[in-house]
From Swiss-Prot:
Co-factor binding details: Binds 1 Fe(2+) ion per subunit.
Enzyme class of the recorded protein, top EC level: oxidoreductase
Keywords carried by this UniProt record: Dioxygenase, Iron, Metal-binding, Oxidoreductase, Vitamin C
One Pfam family per UniProt: 2OG-FeII_Oxy_3
Full protein name: PKHD-type hydroxylase Mpe_A3725
InterPro entries for the chain: Oxoglu/Fe-dep_dioxygenase_dom, PKHD_C, PKHD_hydroxylase, Pro_4_hyd_alph, Pro_4_hyd_alph_FE2OG_OXY
Obligatory cofactor(s): Fe(2+); L-ascorbate
Domain Fe2OG dioxygenase: 78-178
SUPFAM superfamilies, alphabetized: Clavaminate synthase-like (SSF51197)
Organism from which the protein derives: Methylibium petroleiphilum (strain ATCC BAA-1232 / LMG 22953 / PM1)
Length: 226
């Protein structure tokens, strides 16, 4: 399931993050990938242990955990601290797939990458090119969202970033291990949860809504790994 999650950050939060990012030092993005990724990656990133990056990442994680759409879709168990990248002057990232397991920088923890997220910190009018292109079983999808919005997609998807030919594209990106490993099961739970919320708005907590809520939690109880 691929999902647009709007307004993860407010405009003021985006502006503050961009101000701080623009004042810090960036490194060659190839330093954070293996030999295969390094052949197709051309961008800059904040160092994984950057104090500024860690602080800004905490701001993003706090916003995610109170965003009902993200929580409903991802059912997050653990999330790698958000990283930050920057593309300009023709920089790009060729077709690749994310690694199945990620280490949490500065710790001995590892997590399974079920879901990948890109949080846009530049508006579409600020740059040309730079589309995130995701290839899945349903086709090829080009993504270019307003600053503060996020795209969530399965980490099993091939994807690339098109060359940025004008301006600067700044994003945060990270991976989440879901409580529900299987994408199909997670999609079913998401749609059921969204329908329950809509029915509750119309009908309140009537017996049928309570029954559906019970079915949701029983399915989650059956499939969740915590």
């Amino acid at each position: 399931m691929m999902l647009h999650v709007p307004e993860v950050l407010t405009r003021d939060q985006v502006a503050d993050i961009r101000t701080r990012l623009d004042a810090t030092d960036w490194v060659d993005g190839r330093a954070t990938v293996g030999p295969q990724g390094a052949q197709v990656k051309q961008n800059r990133q904040l160092p994984e242990l950057s104090p500024v990056g860690r602080e800004l990442g905490e701001t993003i994680l706090k916003a995610l955990l109170v965003h009902p759409l993200f929580v409903s879709a991802a059912l997050p168990l653990r999330t790698v601290p958000p990283l930050f990248n920057r593309y300009e002057g023709g920089e790009h990232y060729g077709l690749h797939i994310d690694g199945a397991v990620r280490s949490v920088p500065g710790t001995h923890l590892r997590l399974r990458t079920d879901l990948s997220s890109t949080l846009f910190l530049s508006d579409p009018d600020d740059y040309d090119g730079g589309e995130l292109v995701v290839v899945d079983t349903y086709g090829t999808h080009e993504v270019k969202l307003p600053a503060g919005d996020l795209i969530l997609y399965p980490s099993t998807s091939l994807h690339r970033v098109e060359p940025v030919t004008r301006g600067t594209r700044v994003c945060s990106f990270f991976w989440t291990q879901s409580m529900v490993r299987d994408d199909g099961q997670r999609h079913l739970l998401f749609e059921l949860d969204q329908d329950i919320q809509k029915l509750r708005e119309k009908l309140g907590d009537c017996p049928e809504v309570l029954s559906l809520t019970g079915h949701y939690h029983n399915l989650l109880r059956q499939w969740a790994e915590v």
